[in-house]
Amino acid sequence: MADISMPKASAALGETSRAGASIDDAFLALSKVVFADGALDKRTKQLIAVAVAHVTQCPWCIEGHVKGARREGATNEQIMEAIWVAAEMRAGAAYAHANKALAVLDEIDGA
């Protein structure tokens, strides 16, 4: 996962790495294991990561995992389809939470 794009190096980022070097190492080891072939192949895992990166709105994750998905053989169409799945899930959650707003309105209106 060495070629996953990360935020540009800065003094603050360097200090974060120094302050938690063992945590950095553990996270990189976790990433290496998680993104290895397993029950899901690397391409599928990268497509999942593309979708999640869009839901979490992490620009570095989007860049890194789009590159990772392409490296693992994903097509533009597959990458965009993963993004559309993420968009539907995010919109679906907002739609589902409308029930909370309706419950609050019922409380306000005394229903």
UniProtKB/Swiss-Prot annotation:
Disulfide cysteine pairs (residue numbers): none
Protein name as annotated: Uncharacterized protein 4 in cox locus
The organism of origin for this protein: Paracoccus denitrificans
One of the Pfam families matching this protein, by short name: CMD
UniProt cross-references to PANTHER family, sorted A to Z: ALKYL HYDROPEROXIDE REDUCTASE AHPD, BLR3452 PROTEIN
GO MF annotation list: peroxiredoxin activity
Entries under InterPro entries matching the protein: AhpD-like, AhpD_core, CMD-like
